[in-house]
């Protein structure tokens, strides 16, 4: 079997993967900030790094996979205040929803799933070390900031120089910072901050900045120098750049050897995002499509390429997955172990070892399906199931998949005034802090093809999906 090669964002090239310790891989992936339901962009990240850890294990590595949860953040605080609920109530609810979405998509849970609030002492320890090493300072407003000009290699991941950033980036002015590009490590608490959002420190009551959370959790759980760090392309700068500056400023050694970034999800050639109003939650998609169809839709595109979201592409994914299941119908696969010397297995492995080239791996599945259709051979059927299983696919009985209800959920014919009445009932439920009833109304509307979007200030918009 060929050696695994990974596209390393830091090197801007594919490199042969060599773990720091033979036979072991330590991998950290930036997880989700839990203040709302996961959207399709989150789904892509979750599926991509699920594939990565599955393949690493399949080729014999012992993997420690850490994916964090950000459970303290300005967005979380704002949402909790809007809802009139505690931070813990909000984050627990959306962590549960995230786990439900993951289970539906066949995503294996990471080995360790730390919450940021569980590692406050480690974050403060790293901040104090950065201060001792000359990289951090407490500003006049009480915040503790990182001095980017003190870190000689700032910009090595993103390729952005400090001069370019100062000339071209829009940076919010802050008179308390020594440089507008400096970023916060510790935010001084404000009088209006709700309970449960501040911790005691030598710098005063406050909470961690977003970037220090991942540095501290990664170094604590995987060591100060580990193999792979992953996340969405949008995290490359500034989040991952700042992680490098923090971690290497604190430890004096290389933080991570291989940086992996998955591409954006696009709608009509624009990035899917809440600010553009063109995003869909996983739950909205699963109201209309089987979860394995959604997973297949993500898997068949290379992880670094843009993923174009549309009903047409999801319908095509459903038809393609149906072809694979149809090939297995009425063929009893044998139960032998997977033989990597088999030609299809070799082609599949070569694709996956070439920077997780899932389009070529999926093409190999269709080659196998064609041969199964032609020969009805039990050995080929077994290979098809085994190789697809490494991608988290074809795990059900073919008839169970093929007999399921297909097609999009039909709109229930609700008139606009009926929809508005249900929204009003949901608002009343939220005001009464009956969040279960509010969630039930949202789900009921989704079943009829109506998606809700809560806006800042308490208003709610709806659209047909």
From Swiss-Prot:
EC number from the UniProt entry: 6.1.1.16
Amino-acid positions noted as binding Zn(2+) in the UniProt annotation, renumbered to this chain: 30, 214, 239, 243
Protein location: Cytoplasm
GO CC annotations on file: cytosol
Sites where the protein binds ATP: 274
Cofactor note: Binds 1 zinc ion per subunit.
InterPro entries hit by this protein: Cys-tRNA-ligase, Cys-tRNA-synt_Ia_DALR, Cys-tRNA/MSH_ligase, Rossmann-like_a/b/a_fold, tRNA-synt_1_cat_dom, tRNAsynth_Ia_anticodon-bd
Main location: cytoplasm
Motif 'HIGH' region, chain ranges: 32-42
Catalytic reaction list: tRNA(Cys) + L-cysteine + ATP = L-cysteinyl-tRNA(Cys) + AMP + diphosphate
UniProt GO molecular function: ATP binding; cysteine-tRNA ligase activity; zinc ion binding
Origin superkingdom: Bacteria
Subunit structure as annotated in this protein's UniProt entry: Monomer.
PANTHER family (alphabetical): CYSTEINE--TRNA LIGASE, CYTOPLASMIC, CYSTEINYL-TRNA SYNTHETASE
Family: Belongs to the class-I aminoacyl-tRNA synthetase family.
Name of the protein in question: Cysteine--tRNA ligase 2
Organism: Burkholderia lata (strain ATCC 17760 / DSM 23089 / LMG 22485 / NCIMB 9086 / R18194 / 383)
Gene coding for it: cysS2
């Amino acid at each position: 079997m060929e050696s695994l090669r990974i596209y390393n964002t830091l090197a801007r090239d594919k490199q042969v993967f060599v773990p720091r310790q033979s036979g072991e891989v330590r991998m950290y992936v930036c997880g989700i900030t839990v203040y709302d339901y996961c959207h399709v962009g989150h789904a892509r990240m979750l599926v991509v790094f699920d594939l990565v850890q599955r393949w690493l294990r399949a080729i014999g590595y012992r993997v420690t996979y850490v994916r964090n949860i950000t459970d303290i953040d300005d967005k979380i605080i704002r949402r909790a205040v809007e809802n009139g609920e505690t931070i813990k109530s909000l984050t627990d609810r959306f962590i549960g929803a995230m786990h439900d979405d993951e289970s539906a998509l066949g995503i294996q849970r990471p080995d360790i799933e730390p919450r940021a609030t569980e590692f406050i002492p480690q974050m403060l320890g790293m901040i104090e070390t950065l201060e001792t090493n000359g990289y951090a300072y407490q500003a006049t407003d009480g915040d503790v900031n990182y001095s980017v000009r003190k870190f000689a290699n700032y910009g090595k991941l993103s390729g952005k120089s400090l001069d370019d950033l100062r000339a071209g980036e829009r940076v919010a002015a802050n008179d308390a910072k020594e440089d507008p590009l400096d970023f916060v490590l510790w935010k001084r608490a404000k009088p209006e901050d709700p309970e449960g959002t501040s911790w005691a420190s030598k710098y005063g009551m406050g909470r961690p900045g977003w970037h220090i959370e991942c540095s501290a959790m990664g170094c604590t759980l995987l060591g100060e120098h580990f193999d792979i760090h992953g996340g969405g392309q949008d995290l490359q700068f500034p989040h991952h750049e700042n992680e490098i500056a923090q971690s290497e400023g604190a430890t004096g050694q290389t933080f991570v050897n291989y940086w992996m970034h998955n591409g954006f999800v696009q709608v009509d050639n624009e990035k899917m995002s809440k600010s553009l109003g063109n995003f869909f939650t996983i739950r909205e998609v699963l109201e209309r499509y089987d979860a394995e169809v959604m997973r297949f839709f993500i898997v068949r595109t290379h992880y670094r390429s843009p993923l174009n979201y549309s009903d047409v592409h999801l319908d095509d994914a459903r038809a393609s997955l149906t072809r694979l299941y149809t090939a297995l119908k009425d063929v009893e696969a044998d139960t032998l172990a997977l033989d990597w010397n088999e030609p299809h297995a070799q082609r599949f492995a070569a694709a996956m070892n070439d920077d997780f080239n899932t389009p070529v791996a999926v093409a190999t599945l269709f080659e196998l399906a064609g041969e199964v259709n032609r020969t009805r051979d039990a050995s080929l059927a077994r290979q098809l199931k085994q190789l697809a299983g490494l991608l988290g696919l074809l795990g059900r009985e073919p008839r169970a998949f093929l007999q399921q209800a297909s097609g999009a959920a039909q709109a229930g014919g609700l008139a606009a005034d009926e929809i508005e009445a249900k929204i009003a009932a949901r608002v009343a439920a939220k005001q009464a802090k009956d969040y279960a009833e509010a969630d039930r109304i949202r789900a009921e509307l989704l079943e009829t093809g109506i998606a809700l979007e809560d806006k800042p200030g308490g208003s709610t918009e709806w659209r047909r999906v």
